[in-house]
Amino acid sequence: MEIPFGSCLYSCLALLVLLPSLSLAQYESWPYQLQYPEYFQQPPPEHHQHQVPSDVVKIQVRLAGQKRKHNEGRVEVYYEGQWGTVCDDDFSIHAAHVVCREVGYVEAKSWTASSSYGPGEGPIWLDNIYCTGKESTLAACSSNGWGVTDCKHPEDVGVVCSEKRIPGFKFDNSLINQIESLNIQVEDIRIRPILSAFRHRKPVTEGYVEVKEGKAWKQICDKHWTAKNSHVVCGMFGFPAEKTYNPKAYKTFASRRKLRYWKFSMNCTGTEAHISSCKLGPPMFRDPVKNATCENGQPAVVSCVPSQIFSPDGPSRFRKAYKPEQPLVRLRGGAQVGEGRVEVLKNGEWGTVCDDKWDLVSASVVCRELGFGTAKEAVTGSRLGQGIGPIHLNEVQCTGTEKSIIDCKLNTESQGCNHEEDAGVRCNIPIMGFQKKVRLNGGRNPYEGRVEVLTERNGSLVWGNVCGQNWGIVEAMVVCRQLGLGFASNAFQETWYWHGNIFANKVIMSGVKCSGTELSLAHCRHDEEVVCPEGGVQYGAGVACSETAPDLVLNAEIVQQTAYLEDRPMALLQCAMEENCLSASAVHTDPTRGHRRLLRFSSQIHNNGQSDFRPKNGRHAWIWHDCHRHYHSMEVFTYYDLLSLNGTKVAEGHKASFCLEDTECEGDIQKSYECANFGEQGITMGCWDMYRHDIDCQWIDITDVPPGDYLFQVVINPNYEVPESDFSNNIMKCRSRYDGYRIWMYNCHVGGAFSEETEQKFEHFSGLLNNQLSVQ
């Protein structure tokens, strides 16, 4: 098809005019670094705001209801002074595209029927709607006519839009009403520090609230500003609360500056997760006589209270920092600080929350309770991994004013729920600037590369390498978190195959040792003076990051139910001797007439994460063991220990991963790994690997252990060779009693399944819950 030259010229000129106005996100965290050029590779009619034809009814559209993210919700239309809904009859993805563009998103990802975001109120304005997808407004699509419908609100339609915004999109507020929602992108609002005390602090906790309009940042008049507005703004920027400030200093500053005010005011209830959910307040009309928009007022100021870990002066020195009380809720399985599966403490035991009716408001209550801001996303469908144990809460419905999730309206019955429906959150956290102090170079994609850090040397900021000596997966996890790239999938001690920045080839950090919870690499322990004998160009630390990770969890109940003793002849233990599965005294045992006493049990290891568990080494590096005639893909997959009650090791064992495979899987999940015929090894997410009690090395040699009370402990993936989303649940403990002839195992539980107080009771409780007799 030929394109008229004039049309092309007009489009090109329009593009040249528009490009300079684009601004990158004020929000620092990936993935908000939007790549604007890809927007313009799409057909122009898809992404530009159009003038509505004069013969088309003027409407406004918003996304409402029980939203889990800002870019989704029930479709509501403002027509003839009243908000109403749209019926799902004949609705299509083409209509969803029109809706999403009308509220400022590039396109629709999907649409939902049957009031999945809750039933609306008021009239059902549109039914049997048909769009081609090219319309500039929903009002231009064909339908039964305004208000002509046979639908009820349980048929209200919803949409899920792409997270990508239309560059330069402006909210159309030509319809004057006082219940209109704002439509402000998170990158279009900021807290600008004004007083010198706040200008160079991270995070920014106090300053003017400014909205970007076109190319200019504008202040908001404080005439109609309320503490509820401040509460919402602080929550957006990662702060759990707000406080009062000194208005005198700001009044003096305002009197000396020429200010440009936004023409609208805000009217938040204080329960909103995001400023875009607030209503517009009265318009700020300019006084034509005094030429003033905010007469007798000044710019709105917010002063936010950070939690202790984000306080500008450090956790211990910021006395006024927000301090959460004894936690009754926690997050597990998230890659970033402030995200994870929601778990609640009840009767001393941690349990999960079912995602029925889970939305942004309830998620925000959890986030604030933990010292973060409001929720960016209410995560459903166990997308942050499956929990273990009970499901404590269901159908949580918070109003947004609660101090804790346990204060919300909820159902304590969990019928119909399982761990595939575990709820999670992604919370707003303050911008700390950590992301700008580390980078990856030389990798094949943005998720991998040699680690380069920015540090101060001789009064200047310089980039340099990190020594790869003793660099491991825990340190790599911190780097990936700092960059907002998810979990670490690999840690490299050699990066000679990656060409880093030639101006950053000097080692400036060595001896890095992290616990795994740090916000940045600089918070990890490291050498004061750099010591890296092998150098950093070839042996610089590197990482590969991934958005998902596996999560191995041992079934404690299986261990408790299958434990028993066996006196096994040495003649049957020669292979076990070769693989060091017996205690040291076994070398002195008569190989023909002697025997060893073995504590045997079965292990059922589940992968509850979001990706497959694969050995660190490829099959080319697996080790062949001729005696057992099999390959070991991981020389140490688990540790088995028998400890005294004070924690001293009295007997030990270990299990090499001679065969990591899918024994069984949940539901319709297909097995992917099988050891037969030198097959690939691993554990698929949603599957488990069963190590039966009757296979070699599935034991602890307790021949030399005297009778008494002990702690039995199993540690999976003990050397952190393979990354996981949660290492805290890799430990399982049991109380055990051995009388010289029989063994009892009781109170078996996975690490972190109970409160610390309950854990201590388990370790000192003398009661017996089962009686496993020895088999001799």
Curated annotation (Swiss-Prot):
Regulation of catalytic or functional activity: Specifically inhibited by a mouse monoclonal antibody AB0023, inhibition occurs in a non-competitive manner.
Its domain comment says: The fourth SRCR domain plays an important role in optimizing the catalytic activity of the lysyl-oxidase like (LOX) catalytic domain.
Cofactor annotation remark: Contains 1 lysine tyrosylquinone.
Where Ca(2+) is bound, by residue?
551-552, 724, 726, 729-730
Q: What is its EC number?
A: 1.4.3.13
Q: What is this protein's record name? A: Lysyl oxidase homolog 2
**Which of UniProt's keywords are assigned here?**
Basement membrane, Calcium, Chromatin regulator, Chromosome, Copper, Disulfide bond, Endoplasmic reticulum, Extracellular matrix, Glycoprotein, LTQ, Metal-binding, Nucleus, Oxidoreductase, Repeat, Repressor, Secreted, Signal, TPQ, Transcription, Transcription regulation
Q: Where is the SRCR domain?
A: 61-162, 191-305, 329-428, 438-546
Subunit-level organization: Component of some chromatin repressor complex. Interacts with SNAI1. Interacts with TAF10. Interacts with HSPA5. Interacts with EFEMP2.
UniProt lists the family membership as follows: Belongs to the lysyl oxidase family.
Q: Which residues bind Cu cation?
A: 628, 630, 632
The UniProt entry, under PROSITE patterns, shows: LYSYL_OXIDASE, SRCR_1, SRCR_2
Q: Where is this region: Lysyl-oxidase like?
A: 550-753
Q: Which Pfam families match?
A: Lysyl_oxidase, SRCR
Q: What class of enzyme is it?
A: oxidoreductase
Reaction(s) catalysed by this chain's protein: L-lysyl-[protein] + O2 + H2O = (S)-2-amino-6-oxohexanoyl-[protein] + H2O2 + NH4(+)
Q: Which residues form the signal peptide?
A: 1-25
* Disulfide feature: 87-151, 100-161, 131-141, 221-294, 234-304, 268-278, 354-417, 367-427, 398-408, 467-532, 480-545, 514-524, 575-627, 581-697, 659-675, 665-687, 734-748
Which GO CC terms are listed, alphabetically? Answer: basement membrane; chromatin; collagen-containing extracellular matrix; endoplasmic reticulum; extracellular space; membrane; nucleus
Q: Name one GO biological process term.
A: response to copper ion
Q: Lysine tyrosylquinone (Lys-Tyr) crosslink - at what positions?
A: 655-691
